[in-house]
Amino acid sequence: PHEVSLLMSEIVAYHLKDKEHIAIYDPTSGSGSLLINIGHSASKYMSRDSIRYYAQELKENTYNLTRMNLVMRGINPSNIFTRNADTLEDDWPIDLESYPPVLRVDAVVSNPPYSQQWSPEGKELDPRYSEYGLAPKSKADYAFLLHDLYHIKPDGIMTIVLPHGVLFRCGEEERIRTNLIEKN
């Protein structure tokens, strides 16, 4: 809902208010509304030109809306980085200047599709998941959460909208929750 998006935006912007430059990433960007709202909230504390936007979206028609919506809101196109791909299958964003080539950002925000099926096969060594465990094939909620965590800087912030089931489901999800708590 729009109200949740606005709340997330204000929380993220306040957390980042003392930074001169920030990078924000939405791995399930849809039309880009979360990024737009965060950019608007963050611009209370910093120049709009000091914000870099990273967006990834699986659906091609929605992916096209992301960049268009960001540009239509007056965001400098050179600060927009978008990709049409499957977030869980192909890790992005990357930084080829670093090793490993993962891009860490100041904020990751997302509203992924709830309890979507995914393919965990062959991902045991994927650094996004290997430390905490693999989400069950029938529910990718924790796969999205772990992807998001993997991309934040140590002093960064993450906000994500997930179904309440992630708080109490058993099996693999319980093990991931336990690992997240134990590893702080």
Feature-to-residue mapping (PLM):
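Glycine-rich S-adenosyl-L-methionine
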Residues: 128-152
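Short glycine-dipeptide loop
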Residues: 152-158
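Conserved S-adenosyl-L-methionine
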Residues: 2-107, 115-117, 126-128, 143, ...
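Conserved catalytic-core motifs of eukaryotic protein kinase domains, centered on the activation segment
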Residues: 120
